[in-house]
Amino acid sequence: GNYYGYCRVHLNTAY
């Protein structure tokens, strides 16, 4: 995911 804690595929996954 991103540094914000949101992945591109799953907007609710961990880093």
From Swiss-Prot:
Keywords attached to this entry: Hemostasis impairing toxin, Hydrolase, Metal-binding, Metalloprotease, Platelet aggregation activating toxin, Protease, Secreted, Toxin, Zinc
Tissue specificity note: Expressed by the venom gland.
Regulation: Inhibited by the serine protease inhibitor AEBSF.
Subcellular location: Secreted
Keyword Zinc attributed: yes
Family, as annotated: Belongs to the venom metalloproteinase (M12B) family.
Protein purpose: Stimulates platelet aggregation through activation of PAR-1 (F2R).
Organism per entry: Proatheris superciliaris (Lowland swamp viper)
EC nos: 3.4.24.-
Gene Ontology biological process: platelet activation; proteolysis
First-level EC class: hydrolase
Name of the protein in question: Zinc metalloproteinase-disintegrin-like proatherocytin
GO cellular component, one term: extracellular region
KW Secreted (keyword) present: yes
Named cofactor requirement(s): Zn(2+)
Disulfide bonds: none
Gene Ontology MF term list: metal ion binding; metallopeptidase activity; platelet activating factor receptor binding; toxin activity
Cofactor note: Binds 1 zinc ion per subunit.
Chief location category: secreted
